[in-house]
């Protein structure tokens, strides 16, 4: 693997261990040229997924982009990062197991909403405000009412 510091092509693995219940391999690497140390993670990717956007264009699925959007929703909440990582892995496995090469962005948003609903109400509301395109305070009030009644409707923008 290429060194992220000096771009040397052949770094050495110093330590490997399974994480996330064996679903991921964490590797500590060192560059023999500059001495830079860094960590890589190796995951199984069952298939290449494409995301069809609302605009009609398609782009490759980006796990890191999904992680960033969830991290924004859970920012400043006391949630274990490993728990979020497991939730993201579950969402990705769910997408891969659908067997569809192209997945609507709405479907991904729906799966994230379902995951966040079980993790943290505030994160759920934050994500919903973007996913459902909230326009005013009453939109927040509606989703809070749904949560308090235990009937959060994550399908308002998604038709299965």
Curated annotation (Swiss-Prot):
Q: Which UniProt keywords apply?
A: ATP-binding, DNA-binding, Metal-binding, Nucleotide-binding, Repressor, Transcription, Transcription regulation, Zinc, Zinc-finger
Mind telling me what this protein is named? Answer: Transcriptional repressor NrdR
Q: Which NCBIfam families match?
A: transcriptional regulator NrdR (TIGR00244)
Q: List cofactor names only.
A: Zn(2+)
Family assignment from sequence similarity: Belongs to the NrdR family.
Q: Name one GO molecular function term.
A: zinc ion binding
List the unnamed ZnF regions, as residue ranges.
Answer: 3-34
Report domain ATP-cone positions.
49-139
The cofactor binding remark recorded in the entry reads: Binds 1 zinc ion.
Q: Which InterPro entries match?
A: ATP-cone_dom (IPR005144), NrdR-like_N (IPR055173), RNR_NrdR-like (IPR003796)
| Role, per record | Negatively regulates transcription of bacterial ribonucleotide reductase nrd genes and operons by binding to NrdR-boxes.
Q: Name one GO biological process term.
A: negative regulation of DNA-templated transcription
